[in-house]
Amino acid sequence: MKTVFVLNGPNLNALGKREPGIYGGKTLAAIADDCKQAGASLGLGIDFRQSNHEGDLVDWIQEAGDKAAGIVINPGAYSHTSIAIHDAIRSIAPLPVAEVHLSNIHARESFRHVSMVAPVAVGMICGFGPLGYTLALQALAARL
């Protein structure tokens, strides 16, 4: 069975409590369950992780380069600032990476409109809440 790493960046551990008007009321644990269920239906193993630390995300991206068939990543605010995450994803090409955001980053503050991840991802899904993770898994499964 192919494995997809689902990586989550800073503050996503606070989902369910943090700004539910923007991010919804679902917890990250519930999103992990959704991903595992979707993965099972797609024939994919899911390795679901979260960290508030950029270096952890870089380490996991590099690990995925050796162990995974693809990555779904919600880098959180690091989307807009992290050249390190951009470079880590670039270094594991052609491993497919799908970027996910719960909110529509293009309908929010202007500093959120640019993603450092998008140029090295196969695609981005934003604005569909937790469903975005399932959509990203479906999109990756179609490419694998």
Swiss-Prot record:
Q: Which residues does the Swiss-Prot or TrEMBL record annotate as the active site?
A: Y23, H101
Protein name per the record = 3-dehydroquinate dehydratase
Molecular-function GO terms, alphabetical: 3-dehydroquinate dehydratase activity
Q: Describe the subunit structure.
A: Homododecamer.
Q: Which gene encodes it?
A: aroQ
Q: Carries keyword Lyase?
A: yes
Among its keywords, does the record have Mitochondrion?
no
Q: Where is this site: Transition state stabilizer?
A: R18
- EC number(s) on record? 4.2.1.10
Q: Which positions in this protein are listed as binding substrate? A: N74, H80, D87, L102, S103, R112
According to UniProt, this protein's pathway is: Metabolic intermediate biosynthesis; chorismate biosynthesis; chorismate from D-erythrose 4-phosphate and phosphoenolpyruvate: step 3/7
An example of a Gene Ontology BP annotation on this entry? Answer: aromatic amino acid family biosynthetic process
Q: Entry's NCBIfam families?
A: aroQ, PRK05395.1-2, PRK05395.1-3, PRK05395.1-4
What is catalyzed by this enzyme?
Answer: 3-dehydroquinate = 3-dehydroshikimate + H2O
